[in-house]
A protein has these predicted regions:
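Low-complexity, glycine- and small/polar-enriched segments
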Residues: 1-679
Length: 679
């Protein structure tokens, strides 16, 4: 589905005394692809019977939609407008009509895939216009719902899981290009706006059947959208207004979210088949990339300001839960797993600009990862069961939540300010709630850890020259948060203290690298700043029967803030301050609490808090040309702090015949260094 002028192989010249518009609209009605098991009356249904034990509903939407002006010379006395407005939607579900009986139902496998591409492109040789507007406003949604199609059956067989997979893996592009320059008498707006989501649900059966084999639910929601926004020019490009570039993955309603939730089965004395876990997994792994590139001998003159912002706001939510109406059920294990691994980047390469206003580039990542599991177990549970709620920001140490901003080469001159900022913030929260169990039979493990990995950086290298009549500000910030609360009142019965604990782990790396010339007539400020909020809480109170081992709460924070001013750099300010500061821990709030109260049914007296805090803050200045403030001070500082750190252990177990044994363990390593050599 394409609306276009020109192609890769042709280069038409287009002239207009008015406006030039290329607009592509795709699936604005939002119908998409739909598949329903058990409906039997839809032309968009793809239903397969896999053997005799599984039914499959598969909904896929893979489309390419584009609005484009490619190559050639564009001359318009009015405006040039290129817009892509479209929706990629895939929905697959189990029909839950009341006409289906209680027999001959199978395990339901439901998959919804929303993929394909949406593009808004203006790539001309030269362009003359009043204003230019390039906009890609797109939607990509996948929804999968599984469960019982109105009935249950004894002897389902080896297949044992109702499955729902919702995957959104769309790609989106928005581009402005003027290979040989041009003249714009107004402003340029370039926008790439993503409304993306993935939702997978496991429905709860509403019938009550005795003595039957039923399946558990396995639910996955994956949000893997990729978004690229580019502004490219060569030659001489004159702009009489502003340039605004905006690349955003939006968090509005269900958009910006991977949502996976299980229901469960209902009825008395139901036994599981094969698999024994209800599992919900939600993951975001979006990529949002914005590039500004000057090609060859290039020069941009701008009477207004230049603003480039890439921003992603995402959420991953996984919930393994039970319907409140569930009776004395054997439900097996409950597992929820949420993670975010988003990448946001802004790159400015080889751009030569003369700006009458302000140059501002921002890269922003804001994410939340929440995992919630209801307690497993119950009468008649066979074998070991577990409740696990695992929340992650980042997927692993080598796959962190990443936000970066890079300027390489080129020259940027601004009559006002130059602002470069990378901001990385996230929250990981793990929750375990009371389930429906009435005893501790078969419950062996309840855990709710959080793990987070962050990477944040600002880099100005390659001999870039930044000159401002106002101030120059380079800032790399991370704000991290983690919460795990294991309180007996919230969790319920039968809690094994060796496994059940409030537990958080955060690793953060924050860097600023300068290999360039920075000249500010006012102030020059370079900052790397890291702040953490952590709450680990384990409380044995009247709400739960704690047994075995030691009651423990754990917080671990490992982070570094590093500023490097590399060889051949020149930094100068005239009428304001010049500061280079790496700050870590100054605004932390870290609370670690382990507590036993006599009001609980608590068969232990050992209590521990375990805090590990390793913070490195460094400024490394070496082999630079000069660092100079003509009329003010030069401040170079590295600050590694432990403000806001509280640990609390207590045991009140009088009358229970248990001797209290209480310890606080804190390992705190703070390293701050300023290294200046050959300056």
């Amino acid at each position: 589905h394409t609306a276009h002028i020109g192609s890769e192989s042709t280069a038409p010249d287009v002239s207009s005394n008015g406006n030039i518009s290329v607009i592509s609209r795709f699936n604005e009605s939002g119908d998409g692809a739909t598949a329903t098991v058990g409906s039997g009356n839809s032309s968009n249904v793809n239903v397969s019977l896999l053997g005799v034990t599984e039914s499959l509903a598969l909904a896929e939407m893979e489309a390419q939609a584009k609005a484009a002006i490619v190559n050639g010379t564009i001359r318009a006395k009015g405006n040039v407008d290129v817009q892509m407005l479209g929706r990629l939607i895939a929905k697959a579900e189990v029909y839950n009509g009341s006409t289906l009986g209680l027999y001959n139902a199978t395990v339901m496998v439901v998959r919804a895939n929303a993929k394909g591409s949406m593009e808004a492109l203006l790539n001309a040789k030269t362009i003359e216009a009043a204003t230019v507007n390039v906009k890609n406003d797109y939607y990509a949604q996948s929804e999968a719902e599984t469960g019982f199609a109105g009935g249950l059956v004894a002897g389902i067989g080896s297949a044992s899981s109702n499955v729902a997979y919702a995957t959104t893996s769309s790609t989106a592009k928005a581009a402005f290009g003027a290979a040989a320059g041009g003249n714009i008498t107004g402003s340029i707006s370039l926008e790439n706006l993503g409304h993306v989501s993935a939702k997978a649900l496991g429905r709860s059966a509403t019938v009550t059947v005795s003595g039957l084999n039923v399946a558990v639910n396995v639910i996955n929601a994956d949000l893997n959208a990729v978004q690229n926004t580019s502004f490219t020019y060569g030659g001489k490009l004159d702009i009489k207004g502003d340039v605004n570039i905006r690349s955003e993955i939006l968090r509005e309603g269900d958009f910006g979210k991977a949502d996976a939730q299980t229901g469960s089965t209902a009825g008395a004395s139901i036994s599981l088949v094969g698999a024994s876990a209800n599992k919900a997994t939600a993951a975001t792994a979006t990529q949002n990339t914005l590039t500004v590139r000057g090609v060859g001998e290039n020069r941009m003159t701008l009477t207004g300001s230049f603003t480039a912002r890439a921003k992603s706001v995402t959420e991953s939510f996984a919930k393994a839960a039970l319907p409140q109406s569930l009776g004395l059920a054997s439900i097996g294990s409950m597992i929820s797993d949420s993670s975010t691994r988003d990448v946001v980047s802004v790159t400015v390469t080889g751009a030569c600009m003369e700006i009458d206003g302000t140059f501002k580039a921002e890269s922003i990542g804001n994410t939340a990862s929440t995992s919630e599991a209801h307690k497993a177990g119950g009468v008649g549970v066979v074998g070991a069961t577990a409740t696990t709620s695992d929340a992650k920001v980042g997927a692993a140490s080598d796959k962190p939540q990443t936000v970066g901003l890079t300027v390489t080469g080129g020259s940027i001159q601004a009559l006002e300010d130059i602002i470069l900022r990378a901001y990385n913030t996230g929250k990981a929260q793990s929750i375990v709630k009371k389930g429906t169990e009435v005893s501790g039979i078969g419950i062996t493990k309840t855990s709710l850890p959080t793990n987070s990995w962050y990477s944040t950086n600002v880099s100005v290298t390659g001999g870039a020259v930044l000159t401002a009549e106002g101030s120059i500000t380079l800032t790399s910030e991370d704000t991290t948060e983690a919460k795990a609360d294991a309180t007996g009142t919230n969790i319920g019965f039968a809690i094994n203290a060796d496994f059940t604990k409030g537990e958080n782990h955060i690793t953060s790396n924050n860097t600023v690298t300068i290999g360039a010339k920075l000249q500010a007539d006012d102030s020059l400020t370079v900052t790397a700043d890291s702040k953490a909020t952590m709450t680990a809480k384990t409380v044995a109170d009247g709400g739960g029967f704690f047994t075995k081992g030691t009651l423990t709460a754990i917080n671990e924070l490992i982070r570094s803030c590093l500023i490097t001013v590399a060889e051949n750099s020149d930094l100068s300010a005239n009428h304001g301050s010049l500061s280079i500061c790496a700050n870590a821990g100054e605004n932390d709030v870290i609370t670690t609490t382990a507590k036993i109260t006599s009001g609980g049914v608590v068969a232990l007296g050992k209590v521990r808090t375990d805090l590990t805090l390793r913070t490195t803050s460094k400024v490394d200045v070496h082999d630079v040309g000069s660092i100079q403030n003509r009329f003010g001070a030069v401040t170079i500082r590295a600050n590694a702090s432990q403000n806001g750190v509280v640990t609390n252990s207590s045991a009140d177990c009088s009358g229970l015949g248990v001797a209290p044994d209480v310890h606080n363990q804190a390992t705190i390593e703070l390293e701050s260094d300023v290294n200046i050599r050959n300056v």
